Amino acid sequence: MIGSGTSYHAALAAKNLMEKVLQMKVFASYPIVFKDERIFNKNTLVMGLSHAGMSASTIAGLDKAKANGFGTIAMTAEKGRPVEHHGDVKLYVDIGEEKAGPKTKGYIGSIVTFMIFAFKVALRQEKITQDEFDDYLRRMQASADAIPDIAEATSKWYLQNRNDLMKCRRLYVIGYDNCLADMMEGTLKICEAVRYSVQGFELEEFMHGIYHCIDEDTYMLYVCSKGQYYDRILRLKRYFEEERHSHNFLITHENTNNSKDLVFPFTDDQEFAVLQYIVPMQV
């Protein structure tokens, strides 16, 4: 799967579940990196996603794939776009109109499109049963159904913390595990919409030197989905509160009794958590 920006993040978000159901290695790559690579498996399928359908790098990546004899699928959310002519097959991300430049529906819609594509292929190849297919769709729907409530809770949380957040000029977003893609996409959304200095890091990578630059003027946003690193990210937050006196905000399922934290009863289905934890950073 190749794509830039939101398209890449959507591919990364879908990757693990696609690998699981397809029982094969799945890669998410920036198009320009893929274009310059040299060693490939000859039985490769390349899915090139460009939401607006005009990404020159995604088109170049698809052309590279075709030149190597690979199967290609051109994906876009807008019909009649140039990218359609560079794939053997067209696959539309059917989300309707995106009314703002920064993609929101496009991110979630692309994740769902990648996943359902994988479910259908896996079912056809008898790698999953019809019951498993139906269960994946049911769980996906349950996760997506919570999105409006998450958005409403986020708006209330923002109004509570608006005065503090308006002072922010340097923000770090920290994430991990199944919501790594949400951290990356959330960082991009804040850059595009708020337009001040923001950086995003995977939890362990952040601990390799970056933490040295945190001080009392730094704002920290922790994307705290359930999982094996949940306690570790809470310890990191406590350290910065006690030692660096930074401004700290959690996105979490667990009641912290702290008005700075966005607490919501996320369904926390680990395979579909990416559909939920991104919403606060989109709003």
What are these regions (language model features)?
Residues 136-140, 146-155:
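Long, charged amphipathic helices and adjacent flexible linkers at domain junctions
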Residues 150-167:
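A short, well-structured juxtamembrane/interface segment
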Residues 33-36, 157-160, 206-210:
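Short acidic active-site motifs
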Residues 24-32, 152-156, 200-205:
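Short gly/ser/thr-rich secondary-structure transition/capping motifs
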Residues 13-14, 183-185, 189-192, 279, ...:
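Conserved phosphate/anionic-ligand binding catalytic regions in large, soluble enzymes, centered on
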Residues 1-142, 176, 211, 216-271, ...:
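Glycine-rich phosphate-binding loops that contact phosphosugars or nucleotide phosphates
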Residues 127-130, 158, 197:
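Short, structured loop/turn "capping" segments at alpha-beta junctions
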